[in-house]
């Protein structure tokens, strides 16, 4: 997909990976609609990127479907039809089992999964109506491929984003639509994601104090060992241009991915249906009235 002259809509665009993606898209000649909750950082990002391309900035909570639709309308009125959607907004914080309250489940799933769903539901129908080449990038995590080492709320949300992306790409491809889907599964990236969680979980008993205590340590570790957001942005742009499904930023989890895959393969019966049988089932499911 060619990016020069397109319009890109990016959530979580004021910091980290989102800003890295925005910079990379701007260098390719794409106009930018930047969405984020952090108004000061959003303004700074817009001012920086306006040196490269046409930019509009929107304060947006991705959980708010009505607001999402209004912002989408305004962005397209100012910048033209959105053909690249980057569902990047997310929340992460240090989890322990005592944190698994309904309130926090709703918060994590609402942002990390609901924000992606709301982006897809808002923009995909517009993309399909136009019938022109388009692309959707959903930010998941390496934790969406490995069910170990990270809290269950975050991991659940990211596994869901991977599954959504794989299924959506398959459905769009089967139907012949010119809309690609990429799922970004970053490992450690040099961002302030831990710090941005403070405003959302700071008042939660136990969690807020722990986030305040651990955020500086997590950020220092990511600064030392994490991937550069600009390099991640370049990977995403390359995936859009070449219609790649997966983007991974490092090989740190390769042993865990291998063990998980091996365990799944070992759990399969020695005999029974193979891919041909699954193809029959998929075909039958599509033909159900």
Can you say where each PLM-predicted feature lies in the sequence?
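Canonical Rossmann dinucleotide-binding motif of NAD(H)/NADP(H)-dependent dehydrogenases/reductases
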Residues: 2-33
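Conserved glycine-rich Rossmann-like NAD(P)H-binding loop of the short-chain dehydrogenase/reductase
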Residues: 28-45
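The beta1-alpha1 cofactor-binding region of Rossmann-like NAD(H)/NADP(H)-dependent oxidoreductases
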Residues: 39-40, 58-70, 102
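Substrate-binding pocket helix/loop in short-chain dehydrogenase/reductase
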Residues: 96-97, 101-106
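Active-site helix of classical SDR
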Residues: 120, 157
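Residue(s) in the substrate-gating loop at a strand-loop-helix junction
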Residues: 141
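SDR active-site lid
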Residues: 171-248
């Amino acid at each position: 997909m060619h990016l020069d002259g397109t319009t890109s809509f990016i959530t979580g665009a004021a910091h980290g990976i989102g800003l890295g993606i925005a910079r990379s898209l701007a260098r390719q000649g794409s106009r930018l609609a930047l969405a984020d909750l952090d108004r000061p950082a959003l303004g700074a990002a817009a001012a920086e990127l306006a040196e490269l391309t046409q930019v509009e900035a929107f304060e947006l909570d991705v959980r708010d479907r009505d607001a999402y639709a209004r912002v989408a309308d305004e962005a397209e009125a100012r910048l033209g039809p959105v053909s690249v959607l980057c569902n990047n907004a997310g929340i992460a914080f240090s989890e322990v089992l005592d944190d698994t309250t309904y309130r926090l489940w709703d918060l994590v799933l609402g942002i990390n999964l609901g924000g992606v769903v709301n982006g897809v539901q808002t923009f995909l129908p517009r993309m399909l109506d136009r019938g022109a080449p388009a692309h959707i990038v959903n930010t998941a995590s390496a934790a969406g491929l490995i069910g170990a080492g990270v809290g269950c709320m975050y991991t659940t949300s990211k596994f869901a984003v991977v599954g959504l992306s794989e299924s959506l790409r398959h459905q769009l491809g089967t139907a012949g639509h010119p809309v690609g889907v990429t799922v970004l599964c970053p490992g450690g990236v040099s961002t302030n994601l831990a710090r941005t969680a403070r405003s959302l979980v700071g008042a939660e008993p136990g969690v807020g104090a722990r986030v305040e205590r651990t955020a500086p340590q997590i950020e220092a570790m990511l600064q030392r060992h994490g991937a550069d957001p600009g390099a991640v942005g370049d990977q995403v742009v390359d995936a859009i241009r070449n219609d790649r499904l997966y983007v991974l930023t490092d090989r740190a989890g390769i042993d865990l991915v291998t063990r998980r895959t091996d365990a799944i393969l070992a759990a399969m019966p020695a005999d029974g249906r193979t891919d041909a049988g699954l193809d029959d089932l998929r075909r039958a499911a599509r033909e159900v009235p």
